[in-house]
């Protein structure tokens, strides 16, 4: 009877022994990481076999409780896990970094709401990520692009709705050098304009038409950080992002101003290299033009020393100014101020010479005026003389005839005249003439 009872409970004892051994092994100081996989599998098989051979126990009321045997439930061995550490639940992309992007964190970690204006960047579904860009994403800045160019169109031209021609917008290239940042910004602005975001971009002459939405700001930050890595940004861009890494608009505005400044620099250098002066304009105006160009270039970080500036100025001089004494004799130590001093002196000499010539020599207009006056004054005189000539000749003839008639007529008066030539002659006639002997 006892042997039969022992045989019935022998599997239980075996399981209990295995359980006790297993518990002892767990309680030892041995590192559980040292347990080999073969031992773990063997223990699992033994525990499974013991549980399968265990008979069905009757209800607690029929079978008396035996305090000398261990309970089968207490001998259950926990199932081994696949690894030494429990498997933890992994965080998905939306739950990772829910506070937003860190400074230049990976763009795929940022939760991105659907972008309403460009559906190609936001697949359907709430909290959806950016879709993968086409195969040409990741090209360098030197790769030719359909939108490449030195100028970008006005933002007002980008207000139209999406059409079949701009549904697939070509993304900008990846920035690879800080020196190419302004060229990259030109392409990036075209990319935003083709994405119907031209009205939120400021220009050199006016501010943005409207304020961007939160979705548009997210799209702006994502694309900027994706295509402009932080290690290739200029220092002034990093300074702006260190204050607010989402202030992309400030970067674009300052970039546009720098582009305009670069264009002005090119124009100033071109103007300086093509100067021309021959004295036809005042020397003050010429000096002001050149001085303003030199000051602008100096303020923009392009200083020009006196030697180079004087060479530009002397190359543009012509006429008498080309042979300035100072330029010929002391051009090595010449300054811009000294050169303009000589130009002013020569200009004043030319003006003084012109004033002196106008004083001593009458202008052709004055000569024409004098000739016209002489012709007009002589004609009336000739006409007057011709009109008075017959009257004068007739009166003189009449007077001579009267005198001759009076002399030839006989009378006592005539005898007195013939008889005495020394005495004063007194003529008594109708004209009452008195003649002296010396004048007869």
UniProtKB/Swiss-Prot annotation:
Q: Name one GO cellular component term.
A: cytoplasm
Q: Where is this region: Disordered?
A: 20-84, 137-173, 350-424
- Keyword S-adenosyl-L-methionine on entry: no
Q: Name one GO biological process term.
A: viral translational frameshifting
Query: What are the protein's UniProt keywords?
Result: Cytoplasm, RNA-binding, Transposable element
User: Where is region (RNA-binding) located?
Assistant: 299-401
Induction context: Ty1-BL is a highly expressed element. Induced under amino acid starvation conditions by GCN4.
- Tell me the GO molecular function terms: RNA binding
Q: Where is this site: Cleavage?
A: 401-402
Where does the record place it? Answer: Cytoplasm
Basic and acidic residues bias locations: 363-372
Q: Where is the composition biased (Polar residues)?
A: 20-31, 46-55, 137-168, 373-411
Family annotation (InterPro entries): TYA
- Where is the major localization of this protein? cytoplasm
Q: Which Pfam families match?
A: TYA
Is Cytoplasm set as a keyword in this record?
Answer: yes
- State its role: Capsid protein (CA) is the structural component of the virus-like particle (VLP), forming the shell that encapsulates the retrotransposons dimeric RNA genome. The particles are assembled from trimer-clustered units and there are holes in the capsid shells that allow for the diffusion of macromolecules. CA also has nucleocapsid-like chaperone activity, promoting primer tRNA(i)-Met annealing to the multipartite primer-binding site (PBS), dimerization of Ty1 RNA and initiation of reverse transcription.
- What does the record note on quaternary structure? Homotrimer.
Further information in the entry reads: Retrotransposons are mobile genetic entities that are able to replicate via an RNA intermediate and a reverse transcription step. In contrast to retroviruses, retrotransposons are non-infectious, lack an envelope and remain intracellular. Ty1 retrotransposons belong to the copia elements (pseudoviridae).
Q: What is known of its domains?
A: The C-terminal RNA-binding region of CA is sufficient for all its nucleocapsid-like chaperone activities.
Name of the protein described by the UniProt record: Transposon Ty1-BL Gag polyprotein
Q: Which organism is it from?
A: Saccharomyces cerevisiae (strain ATCC 204508 / S288c) (Baker's yeast)
